[in-house]
């Protein structure tokens, strides 16, 4: 395995260097991880930690355009993040809670950000509204104590798989499947795109990926 692939700890929550999903049987490497929070009455309150895992073919896909670029260049280039978001490879995103949140509390903010993005790019129609409703329904019975996680599995064909875990382990079954490419992309867009909820995660991706992109052939195998 590439030496540059290491685990990351965010607020005592560990993100392993490689994870294998029991849903797909595939392994994914950790692209980056970071905190997400809000400034409330002048204080920055950390709510969640987000880790973005990528299928190994992501390296070759991204290297075609971004090999040789520095971390500083990538951090300032929105197209780099958009290529992660829209790239023809699977992503597995783990959002683990630093503070307790109910499913509806958490999903409401995610949905607000997704809908705002979809409307801004003109891709919010009836199908997307229906997909967002399905998204909301999936979170209704869920509660997230500290350390609990949501997993978003994003496939290149636009399927978003949701699963919920009381800890950081990947569940064997998904709680919901949302078949809408625009909505699936919007979830990651709001995390690392133009109006990212986790600048920390964006910095981490830009810091870690250049070494991999410059290395060339990369396979984690399974």
Curated annotation (Swiss-Prot):
pH dependence of this protein's activity: Optimum pH is 7-8.5 with 4,2',4'-trihydroxychalcone as substrate, at 25 degrees Celsius.
Alphabetical list of Gene3D superfamilies matching this protein: 1.10.890.20, 3.50.70.10
Family matches, as InterPro entries: CFI (IPR044164), Chalcone_isomerase (IPR016087), Chalcone_isomerase_3-sand (IPR016088), Chalcone_isomerase_bundle_sf (IPR016089), Chalcone_isomerase_sf (IPR036298)
GO MF terms held by the record: chalcone isomerase activity
Gene Ontology biological process terms in this record: flavonoid biosynthetic process
Any Pfam family: Chalcone
Biological pathway: Secondary metabolite biosynthesis; flavonoid biosynthesis
Binding-site residues, substrate: 48, 113, 190
Stated consequence of mutating residue 48 to S: Reduced reaction rate
Keywords: Flavonoid biosynthesis, Isomerase
Tree of life domain: Eukaryota
Other comment: Part of the biosynthetic pathway for all classes of flavonoids, a large class of secondary plant metabolites, many of which are brightly colored.
Function, as annotated: Catalyzes the intramolecular cyclization of bicyclic chalcones into tricyclic (S)-flavanones. Responsible for the isomerization of 4,2',4',6'-tetrahydroxychalcone (also termed chalcone) into naringenin.
Name of the protein described by the UniProt record: Chalcone--flavanone isomerase 1
């Amino acid at each position: 395995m590439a030496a540059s692939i290491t685990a990351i700890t965010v607020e005592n929550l560990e993100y392993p260097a490689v994870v294998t999903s029991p849903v797909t049987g595939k392994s994914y490497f950790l692209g980056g991880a970071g905190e997400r929070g809000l400034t409330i009455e002048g204080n920055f309150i950390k709510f969640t930690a987000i880790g973005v895992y990528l299928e190994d073919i992501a390296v070759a896909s991204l290297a075609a355009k971004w090999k040789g670029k520095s971390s500083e260049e990538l951090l300032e280039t929105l197209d780099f993040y958009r290529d992660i978001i829209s790239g023809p490879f699977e992503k597995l995103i783990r959002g683990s809670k630093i503070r307790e949140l109910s499913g509806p509390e958490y999903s409401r903010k995610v949905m607000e950000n997704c809908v705002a993005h979809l409307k801004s790019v003109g891709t919010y129609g009836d199908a997307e509204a229906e997909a967002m409703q399905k998204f909301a329904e999936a979170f209704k019975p869920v509660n997230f104590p500290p350390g609990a996680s949501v997993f978003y599995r994003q496939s290149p064909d636009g399927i978003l798989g949701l699963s919920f875990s009381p800890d950081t382990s990947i569940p064997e079954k998904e709680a919901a499947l949302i078949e809408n490419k625009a909505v699936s992309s919007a979830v990651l867009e709001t995390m690392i795109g133009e109006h990212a909820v986790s600048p920390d995660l964006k910095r981490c991706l830009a810091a870690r990926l250049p070494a991999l992109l410059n290395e060339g052939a990369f396979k984690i195998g399974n």
